[in-house]
Amino acid sequence: MGSRGNFGSKLGVILATAGSAVGLGNVWRFPYMAGQNGGAAFILIYLVCIILLGLPGMMSEFIIGRHSASNAARAYSNLGKNKAWGTVGLVGVITSMIILGFYAVVAGWCLQYLYASIIGGVHGDPEYVKTYFQTFASDPIRPTLWAVGFILLTHAVVVRGVRNGIEKASKILMPLLFVLLVVIVIASCSLPGAMKGVQFLFHPDFSKVDENVLLEALGQAFFSLSLGTACLCTYASYFSRQTNLLKSASQIVVIDTLIAVLAGLMIFPAAFSVGVQPDSGPSLIFITLPNVFQQAFGDMPVVGYIISVLFYALLVLAALTSTISMHEIGTAMIYEERKITRAKGAWIETITCSIIAVFCSLSQGAVPGLGFFGKDFLTNCDNFTAQLLMPLASIVTCLFLGWYVPKKIVRDEFTNWGTVSGKLFPVFLFMIRFVSPICILLIFLHQFGVI
């Protein structure tokens, strides 16, 4: 089976873990929510939610993962001194597998659009761009091949191990992602009328803040950091005893939020320069933004071409940093529990997630009715993980660490065995015992329309 491996540097820890949090949601969800819900007012509320929920949630998974130095399922059972607790970690692993299956479909769309941008395939009037996406997404072959191809690309990184695969890739992908983002932000903000978009994103409008906005900010803080997927727990199992958990968690939150805000500066200035009101989700990046870039840089077609290519390259990088972490969660559990090689474990994970991806891809129009409860299979997978599995795993994690695990173990991990200040430990313990579980419960009820 071989050794588990570990991250070789502090930078590797930060970039790899931040990469797991940074994904397509930073581009297609956060900017739209901020712009629609009070701009800077929403961002401020979001930061408060990060403190109330995000940081305690990350720290909880970090502590469980590092203490056990094993896969997520074994981490919970070892710390809880009972195999039944391993179910919590197993739920996280299953969640990550399902998410990787449907996430790879959208990531595959990004690959197709990167290729199409390079050859000029998505250049045309708004109706053409819309039809292009609908036709492609409903095709039975191409999107499915791209999805499986993306999982294989992810596999190629994960199979090389923690230090030679995940860490090395993160040290390349994350800086490159940031550079591409900054280049597009500069180009977007230089357009005529771009400042209207900047104002839309950053002008604080507290009149828009209501109960719903507060709950949306809580939800964004929860989902943006990959809580409840066993990702943070798995990555923390590769941390050294010298890793300052609170400092690392804070740095990761800053990177994740910074990239989300920069994504807003990439989207809104360009959109407002041509009088387009951006939406969210896949339609934003596959229909709205191709039209926006064509119109905004219409007088500079070469620049428009470059920006389009860079944008989809950016999306591919953002998706890949996320899929690497999702793949590693299942791979680690499979090869450790079955006592096989990492390569064999990675292949089992790849094949399993590819099967899920095929069903998700075909449900987008190629096979009408492929799904349940009036929803397509991809949406079913999304709802099942986001509305049920992730909140369930997270709330149990907080209660498990806050009430069941011996306080001394939690304190020792929090303070790196007394080498780091423990002044905030009582605050952390209060958060995971009371505040974070209540916040997660509110998110759960809000998703089902109860509140």
Language model segments and positions:
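Hydrophobic transmembrane alpha-helices that form the core helical bundles
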Residues: 54-71, 86-132, 316-333, 391, ...
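Membrane-embedded translocation segments of transport machinery
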Residues: 2-3, 7, 11, 167, ...
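Extracellular loop-to-transmembrane helix junctions
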Residues: 5, 34-60, 142-143, 389-393
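C-terminal membrane-solvent junction of multi-pass transporters and transport-like membrane proteins
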Residues: 88-91, 337-350, 382-440
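Loop-to-transmembrane helix boundary motifs in multi-pass membrane proteins
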Residues: 6, 11-13, 20, 144-145, ...
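Transmembrane helix-boundary motif of multi-pass solute transporters/channels
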Residues: 12-47, 236, 247-250, 254-257, ...
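Inter-helical loop and helix-membrane interface segments of multi-pass membrane transporters/permeases
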Residues: 2-5, 32-37, 67, 72-91, ...
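Membrane-interface "cap" regions at the ends of multi-pass membrane proteins
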Residues: 1-28, 57-62, 66-79, 83-90, ...
